[in-house]
């Protein structure tokens, strides 16, 4: 079965961990040097932009997704800082920044307060690189996107926590995604997804019992905090269960010989003991 270059490049980029897009892009550019450079670079950049729009990424602590794409240009909107910007996809940099003015006036009365509380929430609970945005999709609908990302290529690991919440008067729903990649002398990747819906009994929070949710920043952030804490506990419990049960059963048990080791003068008779004695 044959596969063309376009399909191969797109497949490799779409399967890349979110914190490694720059490295994947550079590797693909090096591997495809024998082809038409301009067309290949354009293909790589188009694939990365498609990845960003569908999966949501952050560059320089700014969110990039299909949700904050400007309808009238090729740029994206940074609602938190009121900026329009382009992206150098291959080098993963924000470029061509200009001021943005929201002429649609979809932001509610609590918008600035919500920005402030989410910023404080990130400082309190995210020790890694933190990015967020609040997208006013209509007068009675907000989208909150949060990304916590850590990349340590020297120690062979990257990871991203991504939360995407849709907030309406009826409640809050969304998803939490975790993507961790460890690649020292191997290739191990963990992907986790948790759906959030305030209307479900299991996720129903006391912070959402009264009305006027869309204009109450404190209740929105408190709900997000509760759900993310609960998800973190769930992940830790699953890790412990995996380690104590599934992985433990894979370990090779040592045979029980019931023989005693003489830790006195006879220790030199054992291979390890003789090696230690001879090296003195």
Curated annotation (Swiss-Prot):
The keyword Chloroplast does not apply. InterPro entries: CapZ_alpha, CapZ_alpha/beta, CapZ_alpha/beta_2, CapZ_alpha_1, F-actin_cap_asu_CS. It holds the Pfam family F-actin_cap_A. It is found in: Cytoplasm, Cytoskeleton. GO terms for biological process: actin cytoskeleton organization; barbed-end actin filament capping. Keywords: Actin capping, Actin-binding, Cytoplasm, Cytoskeleton. PROSITE patterns: F_ACTIN_CAPPING_A_2. The keyword Signal does not apply. Its main location: cytoplasm. Belongs to the F-actin-capping protein alpha subunit family. Heterodimer of an alpha and a beta subunit. F-actin-capping proteins bind in a Ca(2+)-independent manner to the fast growing ends of actin filaments (barbed end) thereby blocking the exchange of subunits at these ends. Unlike other capping proteins (such as gelsolin and severin), these proteins do not sever actin filaments. This is F-actin-capping protein subunit alpha. It comes from Candida albicans (strain SC5314 / ATCC MYA-2876) (Yeast). The gene is CAP01.
């Amino acid at each position: 079965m044959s596969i063309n270059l376009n399909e191969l490049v797109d497949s490799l980029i779409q399967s890349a961990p979110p914190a490694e897009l720059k490295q994947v892009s550079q590797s693909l550019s090096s591997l495809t040097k024998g082809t038409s450079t301009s067309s290949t670079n354009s293909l790589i950049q188009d694939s990365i932009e498609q990845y960003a729009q569908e999966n949501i990424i952050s560059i320089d602590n700014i969110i990039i997704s299909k949700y904050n794409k400007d309808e009238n240009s090729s740029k994206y909107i940074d609602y938190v800082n009121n900026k329009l910007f382009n992206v150098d996809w291959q080098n993963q940099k924000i470029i061509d920044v200009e001021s943005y003015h929201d002429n649609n006036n979809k932001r509610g009365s609590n918008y600035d307060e919500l920005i402030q509380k989410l910023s404080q929430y990130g400082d309190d609970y995210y020790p890694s690189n933190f990015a967020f945005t609040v997208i006013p999709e209509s007068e009675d609908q907000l989208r909150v996107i949060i990304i916590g990302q850590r990349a340590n290529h020297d120690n062979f690991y990257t990871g991203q926590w991504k939360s995407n919440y849709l907030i309406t008067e009826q409640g809050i729903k969304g998803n939490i995604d975790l993507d961790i990649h460890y690649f020292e002398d191997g290739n191990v990747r963990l992907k986790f997804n948790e759906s959030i819906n305030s209307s479900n009994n299991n996720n129903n929070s006391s912070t959402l019992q009264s009305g006027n949710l869309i204009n109450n920043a404190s209740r929105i952030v408190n709900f997000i905090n509760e759900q993310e804490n609960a998800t973190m506990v769930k992940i830790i419990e699953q890790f412990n269960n995996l380690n104590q049960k599934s992985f433990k059963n894979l370990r090779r048990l040592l045979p029980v010989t019931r023989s005693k080791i003489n830790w006195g003068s006879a220790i030199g008779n054992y291979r390890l003991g003789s090696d230690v004695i001879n090296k003195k």
